[in-house]
């Protein structure tokens, strides 16, 4: 595999994973407050 393909896949996975994580973290912060 090319480095460009690996980089694109890693960026896509980070975006997909970071989305729900941000929502969960914000929900936890609101719950704690």
Swiss-Prot record:
<protein>
    <recommendedName>
        <fullName>Photosystem II reaction center protein Psb30</fullName>
    </recommendedName>
</protein>
<keyword id="KW-0602">Photosynthesis</keyword>
<dbReference type="GO" id="GO:0015979">
    <property type="term" value="P:photosynthesis"/>
</dbReference>
<keyword id="KW-0793">Thylakoid</keyword>
<comment type="similarity">
    <text>Belongs to the Psb30/Ycf12 family.</text>
</comment>
<keyword id="KW-0934">Plastid</keyword>
<feature type="transmembrane region" description="Helical">
    <location>
        <begin position="5"/>
        <end position="25"/>
    </location>
</feature>
<dbReference type="InterPro" id="IPR010284">
    <property type="entry name" value="PSII_Ycf12_core-subunit"/>
</dbReference>
<dbReference type="GO" id="GO:0009535">
    <property type="term" value="C:chloroplast thylakoid membrane"/>
</dbReference>
<keyword id="KW-0472">Membrane</keyword>
<keyword id="KW-1133">Transmembrane helix</keyword>
<dbReference type="Pfam" id="PF05969">
    <property type="entry name" value="PSII_Ycf12"/>
</dbReference>
<keyword id="KW-0150">Chloroplast</keyword>
<keyword id="KW-0604">Photosystem II</keyword>
<keyword id="KW-0812">Transmembrane</keyword>
<dbReference type="GO" id="GO:0009523">
    <property type="term" value="C:photosystem II"/>
</dbReference>
<comment type="function">
    <text>A core subunit of photosystem II (PSII), probably helps stabilize the reaction center.</text>
</comment>
<comment type="subunit">
    <text>PSII is composed of 1 copy each of membrane proteins PsbA, PsbB, PsbC, PsbD, PsbE, PsbF, PsbH, PsbI, PsbJ, PsbK, PsbL, PsbM, PsbT, PsbX, PsbY, PsbZ, Psb30/Ycf12, peripheral proteins of the oxygen-evolving complex and a large number of cofactors. It forms dimeric complexes.</text>
</comment>
């Amino acid at each position: 595999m090319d480095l460009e393909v690996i980089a694109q896949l890693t960026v896509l996975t980070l975006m997909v994973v970071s989305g729900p994580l941000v929502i969960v973290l914000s929900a936890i912060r609101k719950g704690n407050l």
